[in-house]
Every structure is written in C-alpha cells, then in structure tokens.
Amino acid sequence: MKKLLIIAAMAATAVACTPKTAPELPMETFFRNSEKSDYQISPDGKYFSYMAPWESRRNIFVQQVGSDEAVRITSERERDLAGYFWANDSRILYLKDTGGDENFQLYGVDIDGTDPKAYTAVPGVRTTIIDPLEEIDSLMIIGTNERNPQIFDPYRLNLNTGEKTLLCENPGDVQGWQTDHDGKLRVAYAVIDGVNTQIRYRESEAEEVRPVLTTNFKESVSFAAFTPDNKQVYAVTNLGRDKDALVLMDPATCEEKEVLYTNDTYDLTGVWYSEKEKKLLGVSYEGDDAPLLRP
C-alpha cells in the first residue's frame, strides 16, 4: 500500500511539472496598429487628441476633456498619417506622403473636422517643420525643397491663408535655422567642409545672414534661446573650457557676456526655457548627483 502511494505521488508530481503549452499568437498581433496612440493635449488644456485606426489606417481623433465622445477629424484610407501636432487651440496640423514616396506634405484641419487645408501639397516636394512658433497662433516656419530638390529653404507659413513667404535662400550648406521670440528668422547653422560648423546671424529679416563664428569638431556653440528683448542669446558652449557651460552671448559676435552656469565635472545635457514666460527655468547634466538646477 505504501509503495502504491509513493508511485501515485510521483505520478502527480510529474503531471504538475509538465510545462503548459501557451497558445500561439496570431501573426497580426505583432503588426497591427495599436488601438490608440500619440496622445496630445491642446494648448488650452480643454481637449486631447490621439491616433486610432479607421478603415485600417491611423487617423486623428479629438475629444473634449470630461466627455466620452470623440470626433474623427481625418479620413485617410490609403496611408497612415506620419504624425501630427496642435497648431493652436482650435487647429491641428499633420504630415502625410503619397503612395509611400516619403515626400511628406503639411495639412491642417480644425478640431471639429472642418476647414481642411493642404498647405504644401506639391508633387515631388518634401516639407519639414523648422519652428511651430507655439506663441504665434497663425504662423509657423517650415522648410521645403520646391526651389531645389537637394536643398530646403525656410518659409513663413500663414495658417489662415496658406500663404508662404520665402525667408532666406539656403546656399546648400545650412542644416538648421533659429528664430527669435517674434518669429523672425535670425540664425543659420551651416556645415563647412563636412567637419566645421558655422553660425550665421542677422539683426533683421531685411538683411542676409553673415558668418560670425566657425568652430571645429572639438568645439561647440549652440544658441538655446534669445533673451526676452531678442538682443542677446543664452548659449551652451565649451569654447575656452573643458566642459560645456551656459552663458549669455552677443549673437552678432559670439562674445561671451556672462557665465550663467558651469560644472567642472559634467557637460550640460539640456537647457530648460519657458517660451510662455520668456525665461530660463534650469539646466540639466548627467552624473551621480544630477539634479535639475536653476541658473
């Protein structure tokens, strides 16, 4: 009897240790779109938006905070939207291409789905976002290669009328642009000889940008933001020092006026600036004791 009990116990243990076979997951589980993604909140905080499948393509939905009802504001059937963002409290902009050609164009629509506009729907032309000008509801800075397929020029786009204004012809070496607090294009960053970086500057859009500083691959200067009066800039630089520092700088000469923050051990990894309040909030760096610091 004792032997039978031992055998029964061993059999029960063997059954308990037998691994359970997990059900196979269907292939579409790995490739299908998520039910909802890319959540964003409107600038005034009254609405939120997200992307969700409709007709098997990702489209944009808008929902009022506190409501259970969402409004679909796009109706794309051929291609997923590449991305979207809020232009202001009442309008959303999005990018899409045609047939997978990756020539992304800019479109806009109101949050109730009305007043759709194709801002840059030019065949063979690609659009990039340079500066959404978050504090200027009706304007933004975009780049397109409509003048030259190899070069992106900056334009000011009026979201109400769709009018584009060329701000500067890119000679071909400019890789980035920067605006002041009035939305004026003032700074260009160019790559010289594939190695060196050149900062170009102008006082107003009536002028051409001119070179003010060229740095090699060991040096760095970047403008984080203009001061509230648009006369000087907050810059991160390692010129004349081993580690990056946050300084006040004259953009017309790249002359340092004041050191605002420096760390003898670590480089800065970020500068926090409030566009709404027009002031520095702090800086960050990576280290063992890396807090967010107010300069």
Label for each model-derived stretch:
Residues 1-4:
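Positively charged n-region of N-terminal signal peptides that target proteins for export
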Residues 31-37, 43, 55-60, 75-82, ...:
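Peripheral, non-catalytic segments that deliver or gate enzyme domains
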Residues 6-10:
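Sec-dependent N-terminal signal peptides
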Residues 15-16:
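C-terminal motif of bacterial Sec signal peptides marking the signal peptidase cleavage site
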Residues 63-64:
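Short Gly/aromatic-enriched secondary-structure transition segments
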Residues 20-36, 67-70:
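A short helix->beta-strand "capping" segment at the edge of beta-propeller domains
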